[in-house]
A protein has these predicted regions:
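N-terminal metal-binding scaffold of metallo-dependent hydrolase/deaminase domains
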Residues: 1-46
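Divalent metal-coordination and catalytic microenvironments
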Residues: 10, 28, 33, 56, ...
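C-terminal cap of metal-dependent C-N hydrolases
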Residues: 16, 376-403
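Active-site gating loops and adjacent loop-to-helix segments of metal-dependent hydrolytic enzymes
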Residues: 74-105, 153, 158-168, 227-256, ...
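Metal-coordinating catalytic core of metallo-dependent amide/deamination hydrolases
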Residues: 133-265
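His/Asp/Glu-enriched, well-ordered alpha-helical/loop segment
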Residues: 250-256, 300-386
Length: 403
């Protein structure tokens, strides 16, 4: 028997980056979790169905976080005076090593999953650690919470501390075993191949992971061109490759299956060509890019090449879980890029940033992040009454104030 859900309220979503659709006191109808109608009145076929009326509240799509490190949740706000590589060595690697203990993992991951719920993040793409058992704990907790995610067991077999490094062969064996075990979580929580970044993965490991991604038909996530020191390091490790991006491409870790790369701040035009060719998604992480002095990603330039873009909190390089705050930070950084760097690339608009935080990132999951017909229904109910305002506002203005 089909399950029908009808929501009533002030509806807002972005079917395209340039456009808000706003429907005052409108209706969303979903059958078996998929939107079949969104409009001003109830079609006759559904006239007898129960309606959940949210009054004057706003109804928006759930947020999508395309890049976060779940094990770093307790490190938020630490090391903001350091750049990427010293920050990893001082704070990140010691914390991630603790996840060899599954009980510690359950404690931290439980708090992280609760934070996703509290901030309206209904879909996420997450890094775990190198520990397969702890990564399965994260997947279990997400499934029990009813949150959809791609979760990665991290791979690292070089240039890593002794307490957080794998042997190449064992890393691939563990990854295969983890992929097999991940099938228990069904369609809601899925695995994603996760080489940490090129400096921490040998060519043998990267090639093996590329083969596993194709064998199991699972997507790939990693980091790309976040920091100048990192880029120089990659060049010294792989002098045979023309650029950082092509190291991934040559190891079949870009474009053979759906791929998302975090940061992408310092890409050359040739690398942007490769991103466009492979339709690799960029996870733009504005808070992290500022906190670790990495730079400001050329988002408008990437948009002009029709490269898919989502937003990432990048916990804990980023210190805030809320994607509402991440999207407003993305707008602010785009203004600085425009004023200080290149007047040819206009700042992001609210609709563009909101799109990235919903449908833009949601594309990695399929038809997600919008209330268009055929989309999976992820919805947030927003009560903005505490934001005192005696003036009449449009729905877009109310949303902007709440964000």
């Amino acid at each position: 028997m089909n399950s029908t859900l009808i929501l009533k309220g002030n509806i807002l979503y972005t079917p395209r980056p340039s456009e808000f659709i706003s429907i005052p006191h409108g209706y969303i109808i979903a059958v078996d979790g998929v939107v079949v109608y969104c409009g001003e009145s109830i079609p006759p076929a559904y006239a007898e169905c129960e309606v959940t009326d949210y009054g004057d509240n706003l109804i928006i799509p759930g947020f999508v976080d395309t890049h976060a490190h779940a094990p770093q949740y307790c490190n938020r706000g630490l090391g903001m005076d350091k750049e990427l590589l010293p920050w990893l060595e001082t704070y990140t690697f010691p914390e991630e090593a603790k996840f060899s203990d599954s009980d510690y993992a359950r404690l931290v991951y439980g708090a992280f999953v609760q934070a996703l719920w509290c901030n309206g993040t209904t879909r996420s793409i997450l890094f775990g650690t190198i520990h397969k058992e702890s990564t399965l704990v994260l997947m279990e907790l997400l499934q029990k919470a009813g949150l959809s995610a791609y979760v990665g067991k991290v791979n690292m077999d070089r240039n890593s501390p002794e307490f957080l490094i794998e042997k190449t062969e064992q890393s691939l064996i563990d990854t295969k075993e983890w992929l097999d075990a991940s099938s228990q979580f069904g369609p809601l929580v899925k695995p994603i191949i996760t080489p940490r970044f090129v400096p921490s993965c040998t060519s043998e490991l990267m090639s093996g992971l590329g083969k596993l991604a194709e064998e199991y038909n699972v997507p790939i996530q990693s980091h790309l061109s976040e920091n100048h020191g990192e880029i120089d390091w990659v060049a010294s490790l792989h002098p045979e490759s023309p650029n950082y991006t092509d190291v991934y491409y040559e190891h079949r870790l870009m474009g053979q299956v759906p791929t998302v790369m975090a940061h992408c701040i310092h890409l050359s035009d040739v690398e942007i060509d490769r991103m466009a060719e492979t339709q690799t998604m960029v996870s733009h992480c504005p808070y992290s890019n500022v906190n670790l002095s990495s730079g400001i990603a050329p988002i408008r330039k990437l948009m002009k090449r029709n490269i898919p873009i989502g937003l990432g909190s990048d916990i804990s390089g980023g210190h805030i879980v809320s994607m509402a705050k991440v999207l407003t930070e993305a707008i602010g950084l785009s203004k600085m890029k425009w004023v200080e760097v290149d007047l040819n690339y206009a700042p992001l608009t609210l609709s563009e940033a909101f799109y990235m935080a919903t449908k833009g990132g949601g594309k990695f999951f399929g038809k997600v992040g919008s209330f268009e017909k055929g989309c999976e229904l992820d919805a947030l109910i927003i009560d903005d009454t505490l934001l005192f305002d005696p003036n009449e506002r449009t729905l877009e203005e109310r949303l902007e104030r709440w964000l």
